[in-house]
């Protein structure tokens, strides 16, 4: 029986032997395609090839493409776990022809693979064709020997594919497998086609037309082929099972889930194990491709997937985060085919663990509220949409989790009412938002672009240039002229000023002409390639059409260049030190500092920070040239250039390289290679020095470095040195001996603190006076020690109570600690032999009530509480004694 990995390899090897380029799967986040949230088909990475906008070095390709369908119209989330073939993550096997072979070869390749390589019986196979596609029908007869009754003509759009309202399109031919008459269902096109007997295993798309208008469709000069076969589906067929979740891959993941929870995948728990197995794959691959859980966009979809799995983990009785413990099983099954799982293992593991830990409280609270809201509902009823929306809006409990939780009780959710409530909230938010003047001006730049064209950027070669004012904007309105004292925006036909993008701040400087000067305070990129110089007219009057001289603040630009280049070096140094899962998540390149956000699941140690800084400075000391090349984006990535997650790139990109690696697999090659449109130093030595000044977390799985370069770094080190000298002077020692003196002071302080704590403990246990009962006394035949103490922190009360239990031998202990702010903390303890008679929780709650507090908690033998009124400490002791009596 062939396993999933063997089936994948067989497919790719077959097409490689037949002249196809084996192309790696593209990321789950499509590059340069804002129309898609996730890659959901094999052809996505080739879309521009099919439309003629991009050319590859090959005209035949084959892939095993990672896909996610969990958002928008391709949303299978609610069905996952409850059906045999719904998944959020799946692999799409495919072969593609870009104007090379067409229908006959595509059908021949497909038929030979499934019958000869995979060995499927011919009598188990049938096909569909578009009802007017006689060519495809004839080729199936010729190549496969299929009779007319096994070639079904379908007149609907199910067998005609289109990329959109316009563009490439063409008929499809689908291959179906017959699981046998013991399963209900009819062939495609029949009234029973929705049954599970006949399952589509491969779709062949014949791109032969171009839809120019709704009424006009013409032949493509170079017809192409796009096919897709779900790996999980064909694996089920080849392994003799009818359910995708019974293939070897899912069996291994479900087995790991069973072992981790101690619950078999049977009965009501079967769906939960399946949900966890599927969602583990989707979550892990999305994180590996740079998506992190958040409250918007792709990150929100990921969070929904993760939280749905966590809800099912809770149903299985998991008391601790579960999914990260299953990651090793996934890596064993898929890590060889997709090494990004291995590369990002640490990030995936920590992200899963952190998200589940954070969500646990929300889940418990939400399920409790949902239980209360639905307690009077019976099977067949519906939870009203307003309640579902309140759970979502107020308590952060997603709609799909509400639906999932109620599904087991046969209760539906009024999704229409939920959507009405959601839209009402959005409308209220829009009505309450007044907007801003800046936002109101955004659309003006598109009109200016249409009128005068994009700005030509000259700033890579020069910091000064001449140009012509193309447009002047004041208060969001285009004006013919501006005068002294006015704050305005200027568009020039060409500029050396860099417009803010990629984290690099925009340039400042001056724009001057005959009789006027404009002080540029910022430069932004607006619309599509319009550079907007924002500033104030400091002298004279400027008019549209005036010839101007543009001068960038050179000193400021130099500092920005240094910080930007240092950012690249730090990025690579982080990857070398922490692992290749590190990816840029944001940056700020300013003249006075740099800030770099990156993916990493935990704080960086001092030793790791030092290693990162040393690696970056090592490249700076090389004084190596910083080179820039213009390349096609795919060629650049193929050469190893790092593309930033979420960044949009044109057909041609700038590739910035710097330094020579001295360590690891990159030794002797360029140290840092990134796609970047910013400005950089000419030699790494121009950076001078990089100094990391802080590191911390900014979001789940995202860390932030702040650093200085050049003169700013030197001044920072000088300031640090002055501080050390000042400390040394205060300690009457030298800078070299400061650390020894500080450590000695710390040791002495710890010693004094221990002595003070011991003295307070002795006093609390009977030495000295107190404001309440201090000695052990008998209350209703029970030994009781009650004591009010001051100068003892709340965390030290429990050790005191332990000592008190030893002193009473058998009985009850109560300590009330009163702080300098007048608030009180209370600890009650009950010896083991008395736990059956008294609960420390009940006792401490009585004390808390007397102190003006409420609640308290812990174990039957030890509990803690507090209260705002320490003056009532004696009353608290009396209240506990009353309970004992």
Curated annotation (Swiss-Prot):
A UniProt-annotated Pfam family: tRNA-synt_2c
Keywords on record: Aminoacyl-tRNA synthetase, ATP-binding, Cytoplasm, Ligase, Metal-binding, Nucleotide-binding, Protein biosynthesis, RNA-binding, tRNA-binding, Zinc
Reported function: Catalyzes the attachment of alanine to tRNA(Ala) in a two-step reaction: alanine is first activated by ATP to form Ala-AMP and then transferred to the acceptor end of tRNA(Ala). Also edits incorrectly charged Ser-tRNA(Ala) and Gly-tRNA(Ala) via its editing domain.
Entries under InterPro entries matching the protein: aa-tRNA-synth_II/BPL/LPL, Ala-tRNA-lgiase_IIc, Ala-tRNA-ligase_IIc_anticod-bd, Ala-tRNA-synth_IIc_core, Ala-tRNA-synth_IIc_N, Ala-tRNA_ligase, Ala_tRNA_ligase_euk/bac, DHHA1_dom
CDD domains, per the entry: AlaRS_core
Disulfide bonds: none
Major location (coarse): cytoplasm
Reaction(s) catalysed (UniProt annotation): tRNA(Ala) + L-alanine + ATP = L-alanyl-tRNA(Ala) + AMP + diphosphate
EC number from the UniProt entry: 6.1.1.7
Family: Belongs to the class-II aminoacyl-tRNA synthetase family.
Protein name: Alanine--tRNA ligase
Annotated residues for binding of Zn(2+): 564, 568, 676, 680
Subcellular compartments: Cytoplasm
A biological-process GO annotation: negative regulation of DNA-templated transcription
SUPFAM superfamilies listed in its UniProt record: Class II aaRS and biotin synthetases, Putative anticodon-binding domain of alanyl-tRNA synthetase (AlaRS), ThrRS/AlaRS common domain, Translation proteins
Domain remark text: Consists of three domains; the N-terminal catalytic domain, the editing domain and the C-terminal C-Ala domain. The editing domain removes incorrectly charged amino acids, while the C-Ala domain, along with tRNA(Ala), serves as a bridge to cooperatively bring together the editing and aminoacylation centers thus stimulating deacylation of misacylated tRNAs.
A Gene Ontology term for the protein's cellular component: cytosol
